[in-house]
Amino acid sequence: MSLFIQNDQQRQWMEKIGRIADEFQQTAAEDDEQGRFPAEKIQKLRDAGYTALTLPASHGGGGISVYDMLLFQERLARGDAPTALSIGWHLSVIGELGEGNSWDEDVFAFVAKEVQNGAVINRAATEAKTGSPTRGGRPGTHAVKKDGKWAVNGRKTFTTMSQALDYFLVTAWIEDKQTTGVFLIHKDDPGLSIEETWDMMAMRATGSHDLVLNEVMLDENKLVELLQGPRGAKPNGWLLHIPAIYLGVAQAARDYAVQFASEYSPNSLNGPIKNVPAVQQRTGEMELELLNARHFLFHIAQLYDDPVRRPHLTSELGAAKHIVTNAALSVVDKAMRIVGAKSLERTNPLQRYYRDVRAGLHNPPMDDAVIHKLAAEAFES
C-alpha cells in the first residue's frame, strides 16, 4: 500500500490502524463463530480518535478525505471486516453530512460535538417490505404530529452496529408532507428498542439487528432532512467505504493463500506448491484483479475529492463498487482453489472470508442497478 500513501498523516494513521487491525484479527474468528457484536472494538476505535476522522475540521474533527478513509478502512478490513464495515457506516454518514448537508446548523453543531466526544451514528433506512432504500420504496415507518411533537412508529432491519449506536437517523413517511423525512433519534429515547434478529452467514459480527420504534416522541427540530427522491440518487463518494471493505477481505485471502502456497509441500512434490504452474497462474490472476480493483477505486476517490471534477462523476461511483466487489469475490474464490479442501475447514479463515465477501453483493448500489444506469447513459449520450 506504500504506493497509495501520499503524506505523513496517512502514514501515521496507517501504522496505527495496522496495529489495531492486527489486534482485532485475533478475535475475529471467535466473534464470527458466536455471532457476537464486539462493542469493545468500537470503543477502541473511539478511544483512538478514529470515529471523529471524517468530521470536518471546522467542527473539531479530523477532516479527512474519502481517499484517506478508504486507505484506513481497507487496512482495518484485512484484520476484521465486520468491525470495519460497522464503523464505516458511521464514518461515511458523518463525512457525507459534513460535506454539504441541509441540516439546521445548530443541530449539526450539536451532533458534531457529540461525535467529538465519541458518539457513533448510523442511518436506519431498510425495511423488510421495502428492501434496499436505494430502490425508492416508501418506508412503512411513519411519523405524525401529536401535541407539537413527532410521533414515530415502525421497524427497521439491517441496523448495523445497533448495539453500539448513540444516534439513529431514521427514515419515516410523513403523510402531511407526502414525502420521507429523516429523524435524529437518541438510543435512550423512550419507545426505542433493539430486537436481536441478526443471524446471517456473512458479516455475522456486525450486530445488524432490528430497530423497533414504538410511539417515539421527538421535538420538531429532530426532523433533520426531507428526502427528494430515493436515497442514493445523489452521488455520494463516502459510500466507497463499502467496496474498500471487500477489497480488504480479498487482500487478506490473497495473503493467506500466498503464504500457504509458499509453505505447503506435499510429499508428491520436491518443494512447496508455489512452484506448480496452476498455482502460479491463479496467484498471478489474483494479483492482476487486485491491482485493477485498487487502482480504479482510489482513482475514483481522488476524482471525488476534487470539487472541480466531482460534478462530472456520473456512474463512476457505482462502477467502482461493482468492479471492486466482484473482483473481491473472484480473488477469494481463487485463494480457496489454491489452498484446496483445507479452505473449507471451520478453523480456516478463508471460509469466513468467502462468506463475508458475498455480503458485498447486497450492499448498495446493487449490480443490476449499476449496469442499468451505465446502459441508460450510453443510449442517452
Swiss-Prot record:
Enumerate the UniProt keywords alphabetically: FAD, Flavoprotein, Oxidoreductase
Q: Which domain of life is it from?
A: Bacteria
Enzyme class, UniProt record, top EC level: oxidoreductase
Q: Cite the SUPFAM superfamilies for this sequence.
A: Acyl-CoA dehydrogenase C-terminal domain-like, Acyl-CoA dehydrogenase NM domain-like
Q: Does the keyword Transmembrane apply?
A: no
Q: Which GO terms describe its molecular function?
A: acyl-CoA dehydrogenase activity; flavin adenine dinucleotide binding
Please list the cofactors this protein needs. FAD
> What Enzyme Commission number(s) does the record list for this chain?
1.3.99.-
Cross-referenced InterPro entries, in alphabetical order? Answer: Acyl-CoA_DH_C, Acyl-CoA_Oxase/DH_mid-dom, Acyl-CoA_Oxase/DH_mid-dom_sf, AcylCo_DH-like_C, AcylCoA_DH/ox_N, AcylCoA_DH/ox_N_sf, AcylCoA_DH/oxidase_NM_dom_sf
- A UniProt-annotated Pfam family: Acyl-CoA_dh_2
Chain residues that bind FAD: 158-160, 337-341
Q: Kindly summarize what the UniProt induction comment says about this protein's expression.
A: Induced by methionine. Repressed by sulfate via the cysteine metabolism repressor YrzC/CymR.
> In the UniProt record, does the keyword Flavoprotein occur?
yes
Q: Which family does it belong to?
A: Belongs to the acyl-CoA dehydrogenase family.
Q: What is this protein called?
A: Putative acyl-CoA dehydrogenase YdbM
Q: Which organism is it from?
A: Bacillus subtilis (strain 168)
**The encoding gene:** ydbM
